[in-house]
Amino acid sequence: MKSNFLKIWVCTFFFVEGIVSAWGAGHVAFSPLRGAFCLAGHGRAATIHVDTADYKGVYLAALNLGTDIGKVTGTKADVSTALPMGQGTVIAGTLGRNRRIDEWVKQGKIDVSAIEGKWESFLVQTVEGNLVIAGSDKRGTIFGIYDLSEKIGVSPWHYFADVPVQRHEVLFVNPGRYVQGSPKVKYRGIFLNDEWPSLGGWASTKFGGFNSRFYAHVFELLLRLKANYMWPAMWASSFYEDDPANGQLADDMGIVMGTSHHEPMMRPHKDYTKRRKEVGPWDYATNKEGIDSFFVEGAERSRKYESIVTIGMRGDGDVAMGGGTDEENMAVLSDVIKGQREILGRVHGKDPAGIPQLWAVFTEVQRYYDKGFKVPDDVMLLFCDNNWGYIRRVGPWREQRRKGGMGLYYHIDMNGGPWNDRWINTTTIPKLREQFNLAYQSGIDDLWIVNVGDLKPKELPIDFIMRYAWNPDAIQADETDDYLRGWARQNFSGAHADAIAGIVSRYSQYNLWRKPEVQ
């Protein structure tokens, strides 16, 4: 009887208001702590409240948090849209979309000055015995929810790497107030590429293809890594046409979609190959009408979603525009971009300068840029590595104040003549830190997109790049071993973290020296 009473008391003792300067890794406890908020324990779990006015992605993230709490403690947390009364509820909401949070803000019980109006920021604190996760925007709230999931012991890689969850009888959130500011790199994401036969075969067997069932897991992984951007698989796939639910799911969950460097106007290359006879030759100089019509359909289809539109034009597929000198191709490219922006303005009903766009300075396109080709100031310049993990240029000083900013397209997977580098991780963490730090320090900080091939076996470099993109200042050159140990501890075993980190470090180092697939 005494034991049962103690168990009930432990999970009804909510923490007293307080503010600490830092929450850190120890903000979740696995044993009772006076003044702490009890998430779950001994057959009980706090309800998670999401307002009906909030984003669907917030509700989906809350459902996952409830499931994660169940994985850790054995007791799943329910999600409710009913307005919470009393104490003991996790209230997750976006400023302006959660009645209870907005009410407490007006009453001065929550100070949101540190996150209000900021990009992807969140705070966590208690109010009147409830745990509040308040986001500045949709992804701010979602990141706050998944941040708590990670802290209770659920790895972002729980699905794609089968990372087990360590069980605990109770979960507590320590007293204090935690504020997470905006990321240093605005858009952070991956490109699923060179995906056949490995990822494509698995996705077809497991889900029936690259459909919304498959992408739900990919989007969740990205959000758990605090990433927000993606180029979808495209070798034999059309993201919007293979499953019409794909685009809506991405927008609901909070993922900004784009298309690769040779797929303009939100049209996967497969869209064109299926319509080659209808559209006509992929030659703007001779088939402007057919290609413009193709572009219009892409703009109309994606206009209701959060997207970054790739503009420009290369050849039919991942090749250079053919049939002329650089100067002649540059003249055609100028007409292409002018036409694309006219289409965007017409379809969206506003100045194209207000529509996020990027121009990829990739392979032969960099020659055009070096020869003086310019795009409007509001268009992001996406610089690229040399396909082997070395950036080709740091941010040019003359571009550092451009309105559209600068981004980086980087390969940790490569498929192209004369060599492939696809199925073995050959990228070391120190090299990644060096190259991305060069980009960041030179002002290339608006978007980082990484070609990750089949996703597996590139878990480690993906994890590092996404975390580094959030705050490059947090991992210094002499701290990469610390990161590796932390990664090993989270995804394998604390008892063996040092040994695992050493093995993984040497494995990638030896592979970098020889590039086994290239031999």
Put a short name on every predicted segment.
Residues 155-208, 213-233, 404-407:
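An acidic-aromatic substrate-binding cleft motif
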Residues 79-81, 166-172, 234-235, 241-252, ...:
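Gly/Pro-rich turn-and-neighbor structural signature
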Residues 56, 132-135, 193-212, 227-237, ...:
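The substrate-binding groove and active-site-proximal loops of carbohydrate-active enzymes
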Residues 56-57, 98-99, 140-141, 197-200, ...:
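Flexible loop/turn segments at secondary-structure boundaries
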Residues 23-182:
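Contiguous, structured surface segment used for ligand recognition
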Residues 176-179, 313, 340-519:
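Substrate-binding groove of N-acetylhexosamine-processing glycoside hydrolases
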Residues 1-29:
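Bacterial Sec-dependent N-terminal signal peptides
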Residues 95-97, 123, 127-165, 241-267, ...:
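Hydrophobic or amphipathic alpha-helical targeting/insertion segments
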